[in-house]
Every structure is written in structure tokens, then in C-alpha cells.
Amino acid sequence: MNILKNNSYYFMKLITVCELIILLMSRDIKTRYNGNLLNYMMVLAVPLVWISITVISFQYLNRSVPISTDDISFVIAGILPYLLFRYTITATMRTHSFSTSLAVVSQVKKRHVIFSLAAIEFVNAVIIYIIISLINFLIFSRWEAQKPFLIFEGMVIAWLLGLSFGYFCDALSERFPLVYKAVPVMLRPMFLISAVFYTANELPYSLLSIFSWNPLLHANEIVREGMFEGYHSLYLEPFYPLAFSATLFLAGLIFHLICDTENH
């Protein structure tokens, strides 16, 4: 009987947390976009422009994709996980300012805020993927989703990398405010070393031995294996980005505890 009561208690607590997360997501969307659907659509349009420019540059430079697929599908597989990673970091770095506006609500914890801000970016990425895939199918009759679960897995890993990195940077910023300015600079080379517009299989070993330390490269390769029939990454380590994320979460938690102890 006690087991049933405990299970019921934890289930209700989980429902309460989920409702709180959804409420925080709704509040952030209304605050950021002023409750205007057009503003929200403009935010979604930015990644679409990124993808369009990359596809056009492929065609302009006569860059043939290294996989038997079309340019749009190849670009989606590389650039969307990267954008999800980057936008999730940017979103989670707003945790402090967003939490300050909710300081009077004791029920809201920092972990609720950071998760809700990151969750919005994941939802946005899913919407963008669906929009581009439908356009590609309806206009060019191309649909690449051989293993949907692997696509989802790769996107989740890219999201976790962004969430953990953002959480770690948010913790560092409590002691070192310069982190807010340093993060955008640190993210710039990620576009070049994350296998966004090439595959890991194309890289010579001298470069791969360096780039393979980048966990986002592995997330991109997982998405490619899920999208394209017959593609198999020779250098994929699926557990490495998960271990990397766990390390960042742990380091961020330690920094948060240290800062909280000093503040008290």
C-alpha cells in the first residue's frame, strides 16, 4: 500500500513539474515574441535562411554531396543539429535574467527555467525539420528518413550538448561575467569543425584525430545515419557526446553549489 502511495505521489509531482515547464515555456514565448505569431515565424525563418544559403552555396560552388542524396537533405542533416546546439546554448544563457523576473515565485527553481528555455529550442528544431522536409518532398519528391529513431537520437544528443554547455556557462558566469561575451566567440569555429557541410568519412586521419574530440560531430553523424540509407559513419562514438554532456552537467552543478555556498 505504501508503495502505491509513493508511486502516486511521485507521479503527481512529475505532472506538476511538467505543467510548470509548459507554463514557463508559454511565458517565455509570449515575452520574446510579444504574443505575435508573425514574430515567432520570423524566428523560425532565420534557420531556414541559413539552410537555404548553404544549399545555394553548394550549387554555386558545384560542391557534390558525398552521399547519394540531394543537397537539401544533406544540408539539413548537418546544419540542423548544429543550429539546435547553438540556439540551445544561447537560450540557456538567458536563465539568470529570466529567473530574476520570477524571483517572487518560490515554486520556480533555476533548473525549471533552464529546462523550459532549452525545450523551446528543441520544439523549434522539430518544427523546422518538418517544414523543410515537407517542402523538399512536395517540390522535389525527396524524403530522407530511413531510421527516424536515429534522427531523433542525434537531435536529442545535440540538444543535450547545448543544454549542458549552456548550464555550465551559466554557472561560470556567476563568478566570471565575461563568459557571456566569450561564448559567442567560442562557438564560431564549431560551424567548421562539426561536420556540418561534410562527413567524418571524408576527413583525412590527421584532421579526424582532432575534430573527433568535438562531441557535436558525433551527433551530426548519428543524424546522417538515421536519414540516409546505406550511410555508415566509420568514426562514430555514440556514447562519447553523452559522457561529455554528463561531465559538463556535473561541472556546472559543482560551480553552482560553490557559488551558492559563497553567497550564503
From Swiss-Prot:
Record's subcellular location: Cell inner membrane
A Pfam family this chain is assigned to: ABC2_membrane
KW Cell division (keyword) present: no
A single GO molecular function term of this UniProt record: ABC-type transporter activity
InterPro entries: ABC2_TM, ABC_2_transport
Domain ABC transmembrane type-2, first and last residues per copy: 38-259
A GO CC annotation given for this chain: ATP-binding cassette (ABC) transporter complex
Membrane topology term: Multi-pass membrane protein
Swiss-Prot/TrEMBL GO biological process terms: lipopolysaccharide transport; polysaccharide transport
Sorted UniProt keywords: Cell inner membrane, Cell membrane, Membrane, Polysaccharide transport, Sugar transport, Transmembrane, Transmembrane helix, Transport
Disulphides: none
Main location: membrane
Protein name as catalogued: Vi polysaccharide export inner-membrane protein VexB
Annotated source species: Salmonella typhi
